[in-house]
């Protein structure tokens, strides 16, 4: 079992990191008292191999020796990896003032500034023994995600599932699309009597559209757009991306262009799915 312990100063990004770990398949528990950690791991044994626990100042033992004892006396087969997130006092003060949240150590006799300073001093023993110390003062959530993914997975490559979907506007627009392209302005094979009963999967229709320079130009521009922004979409921690291509009836132009785009991106590192909404038994 792999156990990730998330600790750090309040406001430094522990909750954000825990959500990232959940997206990576970890069973996550927020603010678990350390004395209960062994019991939890035994209960989860056999059910999951990935567990993440966050702790804060309110559920840590006061003595450093007790802290080390809890982190070393783990059940057999548990591999511990620990993170400590920190930010400067100034950044934490700004974050709390912006969110108007209550600091866990704030009360009538302690100001926010004092609570931040007290917590920082109290957590120093833990900060000194963790595997990975990350200062989030200048990081956004995507930078933090990249650092953690690199530590856990060894690289920043994330497999993105791209769904290419053709549809007909007269049957309604798909609601799940991230990008939608309207291709109704392109030459329509529907007006060719021989091509009308066919679809964009048939070679005569493909030849008809491939011979039109504007069709190929438009496809190339969509490819360039997606190739430019896919890295940023991946950094946004996406798992799925849906590209919808629509023509009037969803039979010819949208089907052909969807197939062309899917074939182009199949050569990359992404998983590709194709759906032709208005055609039966044509998905792949």
From Swiss-Prot:
One of its GO terms (molecular function) is ATP binding. Transmembrane segments: none annotated. The keyword Ribonucleoprotein does not apply. Keywords: ATP-binding, GTP-binding, Nucleotide-binding. Pfam families: PapZ_C, RapZ-like_N. ATP binds at residues 8-15. GTP binds at residues 56-59. Belongs to the RapZ-like family. Displays ATPase and GTPase activities. HAMAP family: RapZ_like. This is Nucleotide-binding protein Shal_3708. It comes from Shewanella halifaxensis (strain HAW-EB4).
